[in-house]
């Protein structure tokens, strides 16, 4: 939808970091907020992070185990984007995943 740059807080990723397995996951907290759940407290590989700057209209695809995050938006520009998560039909999708909202879902009456 819009350019994602270092200045407006683009994603950063650890090349090859998905090969180390899932070390932590973002989950929905009991209070409705979000938190990290540590699955493996061993250190991440010593790999330099790279910015994933993307121009408007770019599709960015990440492996589910790839360590990634976005930095703060330090500019006067917005950083709107669509995020689509695909999960195989037979996959175990934890109920506490951060994308799961508290039930009952509101606004669909």
Predicted regions, residues:
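Double-stranded beta-helix
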Residues: 4-66
């Amino acid at each position: 939808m819009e350019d994602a740059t270092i200045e407006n807080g683009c994603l950063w990723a650890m090349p090859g970091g998905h090969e180390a397995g899932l070390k932590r996951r973002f989950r929905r907290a009991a209070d409705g907020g979000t938190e990290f759940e540590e699955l493996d407290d061993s250190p991440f590989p010593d790999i330099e992070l790279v910015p994933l700057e993307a121009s408007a209209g770019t599709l960015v695809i990440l492996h589910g185990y790839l360590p990634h995050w976005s930095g703060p938006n330090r500019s006067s520009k917005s950083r709107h984007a669509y995020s689509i998560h695909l999960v195989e039909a037979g996959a175990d999708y934890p109920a506490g995943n951060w994308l799961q909202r508290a039930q009952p879902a509101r606004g669909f009456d």
